[in-house]
Swiss-Prot record:
Phosphoserine modification, residue list: S2, S46, S264, S275, S285, S286, S289, S294, S297
Residue stretches in coiled coil: none
N-acetylserine sites (modified residues): S2
Subunit structure: Homodimer, and heterodimer with NHERF2. Binds the N-termini of EZR, RDX and MSN. Binds the C-termini of PDGFRA, PDGFRB, ADRB2 and NOS2. Binds ARHGAP17, EPI64, RACK1, OPRK1, GNAQ, CTNNB1, PLCB3 and CLCN3. Forms a complex with CFTR and SLC4A7. Forms a complex with SLC4A7 and ATP6V1B1. Binds PDZK1. Binds the C-terminus of PAG1. In resting T-cells, part of a PAG1-NHERF1-MSN complex which is disrupted upon TCR activation. Directly interacts with HTR4. Interacts with MCC. Interacts with TRPC4 (via the PDZ-binding domain).
GO cellular component, one term: ruffle
Keyword hit for DNA damage: no
Compositional bias ranges of the Basic and acidic residues kind: 110-119, 127-146, 259-268, 345-355
Primary site of residence: cytoplasm
The keyword Ribonucleoprotein is assigned to this record: no
Lineage: Eukaryota, Metazoa, Chordata, Craniata, Vertebrata
Function: Scaffold protein that connects plasma membrane proteins with members of the ezrin/moesin/radixin family and thereby helps to link them to the actin cytoskeleton and to regulate their surface expression. Necessary for recycling of internalized ADRB2. Was first known to play a role in the regulation of the activity and subcellular location of SLC9A3. Necessary for cAMP-mediated phosphorylation and inhibition of SLC9A3. May enhance Wnt signaling. May participate in HTR4 targeting to microvilli. Involved in the regulation of phosphate reabsorption in the renal proximal tubules.
Domain PDZ span(s) in chain numbering: 14-94, 149-229
Name by which UniProt lists this protein: Na(+)/H(+) exchange regulatory cofactor NHE-RF1
Amino acid sequence: MSADAAAGEPLPRLCCLEKGPNGYGFHLHGEKGKVGQFIRLVEPGSPAEKSGLLAGDRLVEVNGENVEKETHQQVVSRIRAALNAVRLLVVDPETDERLKKLGVSIREELLRPQEKSEQAEPPAAADTHEAGDQNEAEKSHLRELRPRLCTMKKGPNGYGFNLHSDKSKPGQFIRAVDPDSPAEASGLRAQDRIVEVNGVCMEGKQHGDVVSAIKGGGDEAKLLVVDKETDEFFKKCKVIPSQEHLDGPLPEPFSNGEIQKESSREALVEPASESPRPALARSASSDTSEELNSQDSPKRQVSTEPSSTSSSSSDPILDLNISLAVAKERAHQKRSSKRAPQMDWSKKNELFSNL
């Protein structure tokens, strides 16, 4: 940035617009008693709003051509002739007045020294500062993402803003702010979302509730609002903005995905380690897990087969993983165990003699 700009010298603004489906999204008009064409209204979410164009700006140049003395129709024709993109040099009322007092002719060249000074830094120097300034830039960016408290007193025409709700997202939003209104003077902007009205949280409230809260404040209203970027930041932090965040510490976004993954893995492991198993079941499960990584596991299963067949037959893991030979052997043992034990002949004779 140039020294003059850093010292606070007023400068015009260059707004570059690309035509959208609904045009550029601003209204141009002339004012009685004033020379030139002025921006009357900037539609929310339009290319004009994204370019930085503001209601009340005076149009100085269109694509580098001065239009200060042209008629309304001539200016409109120039903008339409630009087809799908246009470059507008504008000044806000305050800057316009200061430049006139200084006797400075407003033109696009006023911005070029600033651009050259920004590009004059050699790449090596830029690389040197880049790593060191990155964290500071991020911190500065976080400091900017704060709610704003807009305090306004009702004027002859009210506060000078329109409130609306959006079906696609919850909350009450500022649709438009009238030029030179109490709302504009308070810093209220189009697309701001209302968080508090006169210190009362409006989260989850309906349109009628918010309107009633504003009217309930009498001739003064204090609106805590957030712009779109700040709103998204606080939602990532899972925190509702409040007046404490106007100058207090800001929350930090967090991600617990990895923590949840770790805890879920522990949840799967812990029951297996805590639930008591017989020695037979433990040996079987170890053999089964090794089977996925080794071709020798069947040999280990045969060698580690226990002598007790009644408990092994109740374990489904063993039944699913035994070899054919082991299965035949168990079936043979099972049939043998069902046969009646042989009777001692001496007892047999004794039994018959008793009958």
